[in-house]
Amino acid sequence: MEANGFGLQNFPELKNDTFLRAAWGEETDYTPVWCMRQAGRYLPEFRETRAAQDFFSTCRSPEACCELTLQPLRRFPLDAAIIFSDILVVPQALGMEVTMVPGKGPSFPEPLREERDLERLRDPAAAASELGYVFQAITLTRQRLAGRVPLIGFAGAPWTLMTYMVEGGSSSTMAQAKRWLYQRPQASHKLLGILTDVLVPYLIGQVAAGAQALQLFESHAGHLGTELFSKFALPYIRDVAKRVKAGLQKAGLAPVPMIIFAKDGHFALEELAQAGYEVVGLDWTVAPKKARERVGKAVTLQGNLDPCALYASEEEIGRLVQQMLDDFGPQRYIANLGHGLYPDMDPERVGAFVDAVHKHSRLLRQN
């Protein structure tokens, strides 16, 4: 029995806890695997389901989110599901308009330009209560998973969310967001604090609704050097973990493993390993053996095959997976890609990746 905002939930018993055991640092019989963006446009059934409505309407439909989350599990023997949603539901909940422009990505018609624009943002407590549709999607999906594998909830980290809110969309340089850090450090901290104040109840709410693990995406870590990262990203990454854990305990909810994925944040690996997360996700630019040396045995590592490796032949994918697993070692490890799946990828190659992880990790343990 688990509590959530809708009363006590009776969820089906979990049959495959390999992913959770690896996340907690316990021994596993094989290496668990899932893929970032496993519910994505590379699947024809995903494109068919999504064609019916615009992107954020889909995000607000618990039924559609549940269906999209389950689709990859019908095809592949994945060891975890991740709820279909988007990190930008948080700026929306704060009252900002966000649209998804086909072929271009997210767009904010009125980005934050001045410090006074922060006054437009909704109160963080009110913003968190706007996200009930995500909680409903999680509860529905957890029921329909029928205990097959654990369900991961997620959110974007404060700095990454700030970049979209200030830039007004994607950017190759993040120059406007970084200008804020240099010219308006206090306003930047204020905004990052507001985002943290929304993320904490949002992530706790996801667990209350049925999420069994949480991943925080710091997708734009690589745009910050060591100094800016330690000033404007890391303190909030730490704060989210600390406050979510305390909040779960206060609400009488069981702890869940938390994953931090800071893309291109290899310069802060040691700090991330000590930021209060059980798992550190790696992108493909990090050598597994070196990462293991740098973080020690205190955390589980997740990653980190180059997604583009899935354009290779199945034989080559098998070889690359074998190398990756040999380098990471059998325990305290969750296999994944170093970034999300791309829309033009062949589902059969994704299947080959998943199968190769299971096959080789079992052989690795026998030897």
Swiss-Prot record:
Keywords for the protein's UniProt record, in alphabetical order: Acetylation, Cytoplasm, Decarboxylase, Heme biosynthesis, Lyase, Porphyrin biosynthesis
Keyword Cell cycle: no
Main location: cytoplasm
Record: residues binding coproporphyrinogen III: 37, 39, 41, 86, 164, 219, 339
Residues with N-acetylmethionine modification: 1
Location of this chain's protein in the cell: Cytoplasm, Cytosol
Functional pathway: Porphyrin-containing compound metabolism; protoporphyrin-IX biosynthesis; coproporphyrinogen-III from 5-aminolevulinate: step 4/4
Enzyme Commission number(s) of this protein: 4.1.1.37
One Pfam entry name: URO-D
GO molecular function ontology, one term from the record: uroporphyrinogen decarboxylase activity
Gene3D superfamilies: 3.20.20.210
Site (Transition state stabilizer): 86
Catalytic activity of the protein: uroporphyrinogen III + 4 H(+) = coproporphyrinogen III + 4 CO2; uroporphyrinogen I + 4 H(+) = coproporphyrinogen I + 4 CO2
Keyword Acetylation part of the UniProt annotation: yes
HAMAP family (UniProt xref): URO_D
Family: Belongs to the uroporphyrinogen decarboxylase family.
Record's function text: Catalyzes the sequential decarboxylation of the four acetate side chains of uroporphyrinogen to form coproporphyrinogen and participates in the fifth step in the heme biosynthetic pathway. Isomer I or isomer III of uroporphyrinogen may serve as substrate, but only coproporphyrinogen III can ultimately be converted to heme. In vitro also decarboxylates pentacarboxylate porphyrinogen I.
Annotated protein name in UniProt: Uroporphyrinogen decarboxylase
UniProt source species: Mus musculus
Taxonomic lineage from the root: Eukaryota, Metazoa, Chordata, Craniata, Vertebrata
